[in-house]
UniProtKB/Swiss-Prot annotation:
Belongs to the LCA5 family. Residues 105-300, 448-479 form a coiled coil. Disruption phenotype: Deficient mice exhibit retinal patches of depigmentation, lack rod and cone ERG responses to light stimuli, and show loss of ciliary intraflagellar transport function in photoreceptors leading to failure of outer segment formation and photoreceptor degeneration. PANTHER family: C21ORF13-RELATED, LEBERCILIN. Residues 1-14, 49-63, 404-417, 496-505, 592-608 have a biased composition (Basic and acidic residues). One of its GO terms (biological process) is protein transport. This is Lebercilin. It comes from Mus musculus (Mouse). Residues 570-591 have a biased composition (Polar residues).
């Protein structure tokens, strides 16, 4: 196609080229230079403009190209005819034109070549344009198809969420349908089971009815109905009883719980109160120890030791043999099991109190240790006043025998009262016994106010009795001729006052505890088992007959002052004490030769009184001088004798009462606690020992 378009142009150029040549040739002579250079100048801008604006040139070619291709064939002959006519005219006009020069030809040929080249380029560009148009059209169609597919894909992607939502809705609907179907299935299975159970029961009842219908030995229906009614009534009664019993059980359980709580509370309160009382007991024990120390310092009767005669010592040894059996009986009867006095693992310490002569004494006769301390100074003054008048008067032994006969009814009455007290104490429970043994009086009597009142009143009574007795002694000393009247009892009787209504509930009552507490574990001294001598001193051990017959009450009614003799504390020189003691004994031994027998009997009465007031140690000053008297009252009574338990080889040396008591510990008291805190006498002690200690002048009993 391009070749076809190119060929007419070439042909046209060739034809046109002939005419210009002819035209140029005709005008060559007139304007050869102007025409020559003008043509290249005109062609050059065209080429340059085409190169600068190829797009515009292409568009122009695209516009004018169809017109060139569609030139009718009729136009060609017209042009040819015109050209021919022009040619013919030029030939006719210039028949004799000269040939152009060579330069012009060359320029023209160059212009022609250039035109041909440009035409070739135009044709090539047109071909390329046609190809590009085809390609553009194909790309547009492809783009359209791609856009259509893309729109279709986007629509499908937007529908995915809706599709998922619809799918979820379908799943929910299917699950709901499945649940309903399962419920229906379960309901159906339940109905089937109920139906099967009903069928089974129906079959069972049918079989039972068949058996009943076949049974011939059954009673009538009315009897069976009555039995059924009675069985139902019994069942109802049984159920009602069960309910009542369960209710009663619940109520009883609640009441028992309340009672148990109350008992526990009471037990805790008792436990706390017991602890308080134990602390108070310890405090009193420490206070008592302090009082003992003070008494040890204030002792004033350490060196007044008499020397007993050999005849008296033999008599004491003979009585000691008879006392050993009774002492063994007391030890046997006084044993107390550990179960009776073990109280809450509390280690009770031994409490030091004054006890009376023997186990037949009334519990009211027990007095506290504090009374002794209060009356210590007063008793020492009375002792000095009585000893100053000791050698002036004398008295026969008849009043003493009359005095003993007057005291027998009182002793029997005391035994009856003691039996009553023992009978009452036997009825006490174990807890009350423990309370009586531990505190010696009920818990409420531990109050300080009542105890102080009782102690004050007891002190006042003791003082009155002591003053009355001293006045009586002074009267007897001033009136030695008045010997026929009956003597006063050595001490006033406390019985009526202690048994008065205001004294009926007083403490200090433990008649059995004295016998039971002698188990060898908490014993601190022997004298609480040894029946007292007169005056509440560490008295001698009586013979069995004397122990079974209680001593007169007046002999041991004064139990607050108990002087005795212990071991020396190193306050004085032992040799000087020995010499002074020997001098004192020699003077006392010479007294029978200087005084008459009446004076000896009166001195014996004084010694008995001093023994009652201050213990046997006070009256021992005249024992050695009067031991030869066969009618000696003290020998008949035997109250002071057991203090001088001397062996056969010790008759020649002087022994003090503390030594005799210590020997008694060594011989008879092997069951005692070996860890006693009392001072022991060595086996090789000197012949005469003067002591200042008061460790032995207080009788101790363990308060359990």
């Amino acid at each position: 196609m391009g070749e076809r378009a190119r060929s007419p142009d070439i042909e046209q150029g060739k034809k046109g080229g002939k005419h210009p040549y002819s035209h140029y040739s005709s005008d060559l002579g007139s304007s050869p230079q102007s025409s020559g250079p003008s043509s290249p100048v005109n062609t050059t801008p065209c080429a340059s403009t085409r190169e600068k604006n190829p797009k515009r040139h292409l568009s122009d070619n695209q516009v004018h190209h169809p017109t060139v291709r569609k030139v009718s064939p009729k136009a060609v002959p017209s042009k040819k005819g015109i050209r021919v006519g022009f040619r013919s005219q030029s030939l006719n006009r210039e028949p004799l034109r000269k040939d152009p020069d060579i330069v012009t030809k060359r320029v023209l040929s160059a212009r022609l070549l250039k035109i041909n080249e440009l035409q070739n380029e135009v044709s090539e560009l047109q071909v390329k344009l046609a190809q590009l148009l085809k390609e553009n059209k194909a790309l547009k169609s492809l783009q359209y198809r791609q856009e259509k597919a893309l729109n279709k894909f986007e629509d499908a992607e937007n529908e995915i969420s809706q599709l998922i939502h619809r799918h979820n809705n379908e799943i929910t609907a299917l699950k709901e349908r499945l649940r309903k179907s399962q419920e229906k299935e379960r309901a159906t299975e339940k109905r089937v089971k109920e139906t099967e159970g009903e069928l089974f029961r129906t079959k069972f009842s049918l079989q039972k009815l068949k058996k009943i219908s076949e049974a011939r030995h059954l009673p009538e229906r009315d009897d069976l109905a009555k039995k059924l009614v009675s069985a139902e009534l019994k069942l109802d009664d049984t159920e009602r009883k069960i309910k009542e019993l369960s209710k009663n059980l619940e109520l009883s359980t609640n009441s028992f719980q309340r009672q148990l709580l109350a008992e526990r509370k009471r037990a805790f309160e008792a436990y706390d109160e017991n602890k308080v009382l134990q602390k108070e007991l310890q405090r009193l024990h420490h206070k008592l120890k302090e009082k003992e120390k003070e008494l040890d310092i204030k002792n004033i009767y350490a060196n007044r030791l008499p020397k007993s005669s050999p005849k008296k010592e033999k008599e004491i040894e003979r009585k000691h043999v008879s006392c050993q059996s009774d002492f063994t009986d007391q030890c046997t009867k006084g044993v107390q099991t550990a179960e009776d006095f073990e109280l809450e693992d509390f280690p009770f310490t031994a409490q030091t109190v004054l006890c009376y002569e023997n186990r037949w004494d009334e519990p009211e006769y027990l007095s506290s240790y504090l009374e002794y301390q209060d009356l210590n100074k007063h008793g020492s003054e009375m002792l000095s006043s009585v000893l100053g008048q000791e050698g002036k008067y004398d008295e026969d032994e008849d009043p003493c025998s009359a005095k003993q006969e007057a005291r027998k009814p009182e002793s029997e009455w005391a035994r009856e009262e003691l039996d009553k007290v023992k009978g009452k104490s036997a009825l006490l429970g174990r807890a009350e016994k423990l309370a009586l043994e531990a505190g010696r009086f009920p818990t409420e009597n531990y109050q300080a106010q009542s105890v102080d009142k009782f102690e004050d009143e007891a002190e006042r009574l003791k003082t009155e009795m002591l003053l009355a007795k001293l006045n009586e002694i002074n009267k007897e000393l001033q009136d030695p001729q008045n010997l026929g009247r009956a003597p006063l009892p050595l001490l006033p009787n406390f019985e009526s006052k202690l048994h008065s209504p205001d004294r009926s509930t007083r403490p200090y009552s433990f008649p059995e505890s004295l016998d039971r507490s002698f188990n060898g574990q908490h014993l601190q001294d022997l004298s609480f088992l040894t029946p007292r001598g007169e005056g509440g001193s560490p008295g001698p051990i009586r013979s069995p007959g004397q122990i079974r017959s209680p001593a007169p009450l007046d002999e041991f009614s004064f139990g607050s002052y108990v002087p005795s003799f212990g071991k020396t504390l190193g306050k004085s020189n032992p040799p000087s004490q020995k010499s002074s003691l020997l001098d004192f004994q020699s003077n006392s031994s010479e007294s029978p030769s200087k005084d008459s027998l009446d004076l000896m009997s009166r001195k014996e009465k004084k010694a008995t009184l001093m023994e009652q007031l201050f213990g046997p140690s006070a009256s021992n000053t005249s024992v050695s001088s009067k031991s030869t008297d066969p009618h000696f009252p003290a020998a008949s009574r035997g109250d002071m004798d057991p203090l001088h338990f001397l062996s056969g080889d010790r008759n020649s040396r002087v022994r003090e009462p503390g030594d005799e008591e210590e020997d008694l510990f060594l011989r008879e008291g092997r069951s005692f606690n070996p860890n006693r805190h009392r001072l022991k006498h060595a086996s090789n002690k000197p012949t005469v020992t003067a002591v200042d200690s008061v460790d032995e002048d207080i009788e101790e009993v363990t308060l359990r």
